[in-house]
């Protein structure tokens, strides 16, 4: 038996906002869409991200603070080198992401927040 991760689902209060952000950032097409759930997948169809509507969505606090909404997961996106890292951060910022105030990864790992407040990272990943 073979099991592989296919899709990560992000809760949100504004699906179109996140679909626009991630399809523009990753150039992945929408592959499934209903009113309360939209999925996008890599062009190789290896991995996907889906956005599920939650009318009570509260953005996570990052880094975590006692008594605040906790992050349940975050996404790491690999880039080839520091130049690609800089370009990815600039592009994500133009698309509506924010660089997180707290950074722990040095020059090769940048934490950002998408337009709905989900943390994600760009990482110079050589393996």
Task: Indicate where each model-derived feature is located.
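Glyoxalase I/VOC metalloenzyme domain signal
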Residues: 1-6, 10-32, 42-98, 113-127
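Short loop/turn motifs at secondary-structure junctions and domain boundaries
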Residues: 100-104
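Short acidic/glycine-enriched loop/turn segments that link adjacent beta-strands
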Residues: 34-37, 105-108
């Amino acid at each position: 038996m073979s099991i592989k991760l296919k899709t990560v689902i992000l809760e949100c209060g504004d699906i179109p906002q996140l679909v626009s952000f991630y399809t523009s950032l990753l150039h992945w097409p929408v592959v499934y869409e209903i009113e309360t759930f939209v999925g996008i997948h890599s062009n190789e169809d290896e991995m996907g991200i889906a956005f599920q509507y939650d009318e009570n969505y509260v953005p996570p606090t990052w880094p975590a603070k006692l008594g605040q909404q906790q992050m349940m997961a975050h996404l790491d996106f690999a880039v080839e080198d520091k130049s690609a890292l800089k370009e990815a951060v600039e592009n994500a910022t133009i698309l509506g992401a924010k660089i997180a105030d707290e950074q722990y990864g040095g020059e090769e790992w940048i934490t950002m927040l998408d337009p709905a407040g989900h943390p994600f990272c760009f990482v110079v990943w050589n393996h």
